[in-house]
Amino acid sequence: MAVIKKPDLSDPVLKMKLAKGMGHNYYGEPAWPNDLLYIFPVCIFGTFAIVIGLSVMEPAAMGEPANPFATPLEILPEWYFYPVFQLLRVIPNKLLGVLLMAAVPAGLLTVPFIENINKFQNPFRRPIATTVFLLGTVVAVYLGIGSTFPIDQSLTLGLF
């Protein structure tokens, strides 16, 4: 496999481009050292300059100062803990809630053993794994959305 494409110098359009200094990246100029030593550092420094300039012109707001004596009415975890928080909030027995949280990875570990005879990578040809994935995604999104509602509306998402 050739690294450099040899130019067809019988083409008059190419001759005109090469005479004007155009077409050299496509016809014969190697990437090392021309592009890697000159163009890439310019792009990298330009990106750093833009990021630093934007951070200086518009710094992130620090928010209001912390007050340990004024706590919010309802404390919510980070967004990626919303489904787990909703499970612990809705299930009346806390031990059952913790067991359900442990059942999620245990159930995911069983999927390869259930579907071990199917060697396809196409998700449409692996119905059990696809169903587990889609059902888990829908349940996680439902629980995550429900955790942002008050406790009396969290199961119905305020719709009923």
From Swiss-Prot:
GO terms for molecular function: electron transporter, transferring electrons within cytochrome b6/f complex of photosystem II activity; electron transporter, transferring electrons within the cyclic electron transport pathway of photosynthesis activity; ubiquinol-cytochrome-c reductase activity. The keyword RNA-binding does not apply. The keyword Oxidoreductase does not apply. Keywords: Chloroplast, Electron transport, Membrane, Photosynthesis, Plastid, Thylakoid, Transmembrane, Transmembrane helix, Transport. SUPFAM superfamilies: a domain/subunit of cytochrome bc1 complex (Ubiquinol-cytochrome c reductase). Pfam families: Cytochrom_B_C. The chain crosses the membrane at residues 36-56, 95-115, 131-151. It comes from the Eukaryota. It is a multi-pass membrane protein. One of its GO terms (biological process) is photosynthetic electron transport chain. One of its GO terms (cellular component) is chloroplast thylakoid membrane. It is found in: Plastid, Chloroplast thylakoid membrane. PROSITE patterns: CYTB_CTER. Component of the cytochrome b6-f complex, which mediates electron transfer between photosystem II (PSII) and photosystem I (PSI), cyclic electron flow around PSI, and state transitions. Belongs to the cytochrome b family. PetD subfamily. The 4 large subunits of the cytochrome b6-f complex are cytochrome b6, subunit IV (17 kDa polypeptide, petD), cytochrome f and the Rieske protein, while the 4 small subunits are petG, petL, petM and petN. The complex functions as a dimer. This is Cytochrome b6-f complex subunit 4. It comes from Stigeoclonium helveticum.
